[in-house]
């Protein structure tokens, strides 16, 4: 199966490896990039991989991009399997719509997609989720396998914990309810899905 991973190369100058804990998963390995842990968790023998890396052009992202390539190489993922999507340093709607278009165009027609929304400006998660919604509608057989956020808790500059959360349930909830044209039915389905999520087995 072709699996496509989406991440944003961070702007910060200093990246520290973290052990991102996940629910019902094996022990993590240290990484600077939550998407690398996602790849470790989801990649299976025989899978084909490509990674879409959103990055702004500056010295910090260039250094962090090289570090990402090094971590991917340790998983057997070569640089030619990574496709960069360049982002100008502005937040104008036309810029973000252009990035959304580029993401949709870069996604294969048949693939399972895993996206990480940890890094980047506050607009990046909106762009990424919009691109996934559009691609699911326009592509032949595209499935969203997960949408991840890596949270790091600190106190007095010390790391207390690092957690990796899959937000795909929210993405799917919006898709299911958003496609319904009868508001009463949509409201009932929305409340039923929330109720089911609150009572799901851990």
Predicted regions and their residues:
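Long, low-complexity, Lys/Arg-enriched
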Residues: 1-112, 133-202
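Detector for conserved single-position "signature" residues within domains
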Residues: 115
């Amino acid at each position: 199966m072709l699996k496509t991973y989406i991440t944003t190369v961070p702007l910060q100058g200093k990246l520290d490896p973290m052990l991102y804990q996940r629910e019902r998963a094996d022990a993590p390995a240290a990484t600077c990039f939550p998407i690398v842990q996602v790849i470790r968790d989801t990649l299976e023998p025989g899978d084909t991989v490509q990674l879409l890396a959103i990055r702004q052009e500056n010295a910090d992202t260039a250094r962090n991009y090289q570090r990402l390539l090094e971590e991917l190489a340790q998983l057997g993922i070569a640089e030619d399997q990574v496709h960069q999507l360049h982002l100008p340093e502005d937040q104008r709607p036309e810029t973000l719509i252009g990035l959304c278009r580029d993401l949709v165009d870069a996604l294969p027609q048949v693939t399972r997609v895993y996206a990480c929304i940890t890094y980047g400006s506050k607009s990046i998660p909106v762009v990424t989720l919009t691109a996934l919604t559009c691609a699911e509608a326009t592509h032949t057989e595209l499935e969203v396998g997960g949408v991840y956020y890596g949270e790091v808790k600190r106190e007095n500059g010390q790391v207390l914990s690092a957690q990796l959360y899959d937000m795909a349930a929210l993405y799917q909830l919006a898709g299911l309810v958003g496609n319904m044209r009868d508001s009463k039915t949509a409201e009932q389905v929305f409340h039923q899905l929330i109720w089911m999520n609150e009572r799901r087995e851990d």
